[in-house]
């Protein structure tokens, strides 16, 4: 089957934003203008196409990035038909892992900002992730019709808060109630959209007299940014020659792809204005899969670096970036194809696990509908049905050309909750449900507490776990009781020690003998967490028992001696020991190592570590004192304060997670609902003695 759309006309883009910037409405309008949805879904009434999971509709926030395919030929049908694969990314801080995952498979992104709220804390997190994956991006300032909307303030905030280089290519005509359209700085005409057909058609008009001077100024700013693309253009510009529209667009595109500038547009998705021009900018300024460098990876057989070009001629390679459970077809695995072609029914290699997978069926997703397709090619984003054992972030590739594409990094969960099924019947269903959900979401973990036998789920925040429990109920019919949220503490050591243990048993029959001497020392926080170094000389412990020593210690790490929490940041050197020809066994050395480790930890000045969160609170000035006082009471360290640009203050602090439970309710009541906050995990640091004592007491009690 030949390719329907040339790969140069593909745009794989993400729509990314802070939680209330109107991203879902923006995505919804994109789907409407690109001809997919006939009735505009409004988030206000819970009907948006991309928010296809029930809880998202209830909470009015986007949780799962749905991948949707649509087509666009330009506002004035001036382009050949382009194929957009749009990935909707969540804006809530508990779902940063989703954003990270979608950034990995995007070629370009549209950052949506609120014209009133501007650059929010979460916008900064998303920006950092886009930088990490070097994603070229445009900015779209939405909600220009709202009270307090100010496009130029957002331009300034992007410079100061994101250290971005925004280049407006349109400016607004009016603001708030009087927002009517935009001035296109390339054509130096105003664009007025037709309200009768929801903005599907438009007319060019003259620039309103009061805006001519401002438009001239911003056009010069844009041309200057374009001229910096090459010496040739700069000479032309400095020589006073006019640059043609094609030259300006080409130069802006070149600099956008290089990450040097971020073209900026504005509008009001809700009022059907501006999204259409932004879609044209996606075509003009964001990359096709062929514009970005070949995807990098490693050959699992040789461990050498390898790469794949975005071409059908190359061997097949794809990344599984999302799992979804569908009640009709079971597991859907969303894949981004980087190279080659694969057909339904083909067998491919999961290079991370070294297993073979048969691709049952392939489907193209349009928000909640799906179309069966026969094959996928380089640049495509689609969902595969029938994969048995594939987890998020794994690579699928041709067996004849194995490659592991870059591993995604997922944060460690910071909060635990115990869940108990309400009935015996729920018990089994709960196990299945939790395993499925953990497969979909690598930042969510499930384990059984050895002492209490309870099932413990861990995640990135209270909302994250609430949604997991909610999904168990809706999708799997599991009713569960949940405990109070618990903090994921860790333990470590503060000084270097030497420890020894001899495990010897002689009681008739075969005895047991294992003897180890280890040196323990603290490691840099935030690194590998555990390192084992074999320094045995002269065979005092035979080779075959060395891995058993490592295993004995690894198996002991999850339960530290302070309060039974996992031990991190410790380096172990195995320096000496002895063995018995007959009685030594792997088990004996495991037991000896485990006891030596516990012994060593007691002497090594053990400490309890607690997760510290980076917290940002935006509050009206009159509540400033209360907010600061409250953060101090919560053992917070206030790092700084800024004006938020709309008459309020933004407080940055680091606060232990243990003190943040229920914070949203307290903040609401202290500020009459006018303050907002966001937090994300920052680091682990040593808990003060009185806190450590209380935690230890509670664990023992």
UniProtKB/Swiss-Prot annotation:
It is found in: Cytoplasm. GO terms for biological process: ribosome disassembly. It comes from the Bacteria. GO terms for cellular component: cytoplasm. Keywords: Cytoplasm, Elongation factor, GTP-binding, Nucleotide-binding, Protein biosynthesis. InterPro entries: EFG_II, EFG_III, EFG_III/V, EFG_IV, EFG_V, EFG_V-like, EFTu-like_2, G_TR_CS. Its main location: cytoplasm. HAMAP family: EF_G_EF_2_B. Belongs to the TRAFAC class translation factor GTPase superfamily. Classic translation factor GTPase family. EF-G/EF-2 subfamily. Catalyzes the GTP-dependent ribosomal translocation step during translation elongation. During this step, the ribosome changes from the pre-translocational (PRE) to the post-translocational (POST) state as the newly formed A-site-bound peptidyl-tRNA and P-site-bound deacylated tRNA move to the P and E sites, respectively. Catalyzes the coordinated movement of the two tRNA molecules, the mRNA and conformational changes in the ribosome. This is Elongation factor G. It comes from Neisseria gonorrhoeae (strain ATCC 700825 / FA 1090). The lineage of its organism: Bacteria, Pseudomonadati, Pseudomonadota, Betaproteobacteria, Neisseriales. The gene is fusA.
